[in-house]
Curated annotation (Swiss-Prot):
Gene3D superfamilies: 3.30.40.100, DNA-binding pseudobarrel domain (2.40.330.10). It is found in: Nucleus. InterPro entries: B3_DNA-bd (IPR003340), DNA-bd_pseudobarrel_sf (IPR015300), Znf_CW (IPR011124). Residues 221-231, 782-803 have a biased composition (Basic and acidic residues). PROSITE patterns: B3 (PS50863), ZF_CW (PS51050). Residues 218-240, 777-820, 881-949 are annotated as: Disordered. Its main location: nucleus. A zinc finger (CW-type) spans 623-673. Residues 363-464 bind DNA. Residues 806-816 have a biased composition (Polar residues). The lineage of its organism: Eukaryota, Viridiplantae, Streptophyta, Embryophyta, Tracheophyta. The keyword Nucleus applies. This is B3 domain-containing protein Os07g0679700.
Amino acid sequence: MAGMAAAAAALVAAKRCMNAACGAPAPSPAGGEWRKGWPLRSGGFAVLCDKCGLAYEQLVFCDIFHQKESGWRDCSFCGKRLHCGCIASKNSFDLLDSGGVQCVTCIKNSAVQSVPSPVVPKLFSSQNNQRLFGKSDDLLSGRPLETSSLMVDARNDDLTIIAKNNLPFMVKNVEAGQSSNILRQKELENGARQIKWELPTLSIGDMGRIPFLTRSQSALESRRDENKDPTTESTTSESLSEACLNMSLGIASNGNKLEATSTVERPMLSPTTGFPEGRELTTALSPFQHAQRARHFLTRPPRVGEGAVFDPTKDMLPHLRVARPPAEGRGRNQLLPRYWPRITDQELQQISGDSNSTIVPLFEKVLSASDAGRIGRLVLPKACAEAYFPPISQPEGRPLTIQDAKGKEWHFQFRFWPNNNSRMYVLEGVTPCIQSLQLQAGDTVTFSRIEPGGKLVMGFRKATNTVSLPDSQISAIANGSILGDTLFSSTNENLAIVSGYSGFLQSIKGAADLHTSSIYDHHVNSADGDVSWLKTDKFGSRPDEGSLQFLKRGRNIGSKSRRLSMDAEEAWELKLYWDEVQELLRPAPTAKPTVVMIEDYEIEEYDEPPVFAKRSIFTIRSTGEQDQWIQCDDCSKWRRLPLNVIVASKWTCADNTIDSKSCSCSAPEELTPKELHIVLQQYEDMRRRRNSFGFKQNIPEMDAVSLDAFATAAVYGDVGNQGSPSVATTTKHPRHRPGCTCIVCIQPPSGKGPKHNPACTCNVCMTVRRRFKTLMMRKKQRQSEREEAEASKKIAWMNRDEPEGSSLSRSPQTVDTTRDGDVTMFDKVDINKGHIDLNFHPTAVRDEERHGGQPRVSMVSLLEVANRPLENYMKQNGLTSLAGEQGSSSTCTGAATVPQPALVESEERTSNNDGGRVATAEQPESMAVDEAGDNQPDKAAGDSAAALA
């Protein structure tokens, strides 16, 4: 351990500062620590002492230790001395393509002050863009640029890209009478250089066409310096400044005349380097900053004069529909762009006729199915109705007279419906007008106003395939927040797909001295309305305001793609349905199936995966034998094979090892051309029926109407006249694709199409039969359960009443012998009058009466009789008092045990007060005796009280 510590101490002692001018040893623990220096070629970093490392971190290492060494150069922009031949200063400067050097401070300043331009055309590589001012040394030193480095191509008006001596420039032909925004370098008395921007007057003439659209940027014009010497102007050259062409699609005050203007601008400054108007540009930006800002250049378009009109577009775009902003009205700013009128000048002229009146387009609406139907009601957009139609306060509305394009007046009822705290405005009675104009769903109705007079006019436009500008882009154009690159890409794309002008852009490219984007630098005067590009940004506004919002809102994402509808039978034949694919899946030859029963269906299960077989046609002979027919891949002849043979996906006649006569392609075909035609035709008909209706048939069930009936045709004659029945078009419910085989799609409409055979075995019929069978079984089961429940209830009542009745009739009772002669009779209640007795059996009563027996009385009837008032009992029996019965009964002595007499049915004696018939039953003697024996004192008191009453 002592040896290792000594070695470590020796290593630390040998470690010194790598600065040759310093060479300090390892610092003491209290003196400081080592610092990292420049990266070494062998890896790692140089080891410096605290003093040298601090100088290296502050970028003054060479200024302190290498002042007398060679390799020093000045920064091309700030003039700082840089030690270019030292590894310690390797990361403190950068080399310019033109041969100069640039310090790291200038690099950082340029990165902070430069504003990224997302719409800069990718004309040059990033390396060239960063070194755009290749001759910055000449600019700073005051030497003019050599004219030999600018090569102007005078053969066309387009810009020519020059890259000479690693100096890319964009130069356009400068002709007589044409001026440009130039960058002038002027020398002051102290020898310093200033860069001033001037905005000379642009003359009207043949202007060069700029093939690029630039982003929106505000135009600022700086004043001339009064202290400048006009005689010190140096040679002028074309500047590479940022410029902009503010464009907006709009309509002028006169409604038709449009103009194109462009604004020449100076380089855009970051918010931190902005300066007020009149301040010298060099006080805010250094010469290096000017050079760095120039790499974010945008080509400056020329100003188009009043006489410069782009004539070819008149012929190329005669039917371009551009949405016009709506006229003045209540709430016009709330109108959606889809309601803006896209009416052309020709249509306006047709409406106005030869009169001097002015037609003001208001809005338009695409007719829906309900609008064009027989309801006679046209739903109006709420904002449009409130803005341009007369105000109404009652739901009944008011009559409204509107003139059509032919001059005929129509009378409608303009009203509204309250709807969720809002209103839905409608025009009622529009059916005659729509029928007269022969309008359908999808057509467009336009509403305009005739000035003076304010009369409403209704025009129309038939539905076509014309593609208009998207609503999002129209709204962005109207709001004025539009970018050049977005408009260039999206509008060009829309113009290229205008109906009837698909080759519009290609024709412009092929025209002489024209560029693709030149249509944006000139008027587009068409019959649909003039199109112009107007500047929208105000003086001094920031160019990036609202750009991000517009990029999100105005991005052209194309029209909404909808699901492709394939209704044609030819298109259906291109698809392989799942049942057709299953025909190609066959079990492996060595696989043995396991049969499983699921819902009365036998399903074969295999442990091995299926194999792909060749498509074949299965037939049934007149004898009942089944065959399959395979087509050879070489000779295209059809060969007969047994049903159980599995054919590979690629099969030839040489693979036929079963039939030796057909094992060669030279062997004749077994089918005649007529039979083959019948087989193939019926096979296609079967496939079409199966695809349309989900028709499924098992192979053993195919008959003469099936796809392969040539054997039957040979026995019964020609079956060519046996055409398949016509198949009606199915009514598919929504969200189901063509070829759907659900139970709704495969059935024909109600009352249409062929009827199914009662013995049909299709999927629908089998499903219906299975469901009907299940329903009938459930119905019978419920009925039997109900009958069993009723029978069990009856048996329970009978078992409960039977011991009670038998005890009354069979049990011996102790009776008083003195009352044998007096038998109290109760009326039997007629249970068929007003009540339903569940224990009443008419058949049993008839049987008892037939055999001389007496019917049995239930406990319910006895309880009802016992609950009757005593007065009714006395009236029914003709008794006025119970004293006589009581006295006579008292003379009888002794008691005897006698059987209870049976209950007998008595005749109807009296009727109650309300006229109802009442039947009575004779009371058993035991009950009377029981009451007399058990409660004799109480009954005597009760009888005496009744007698007194």
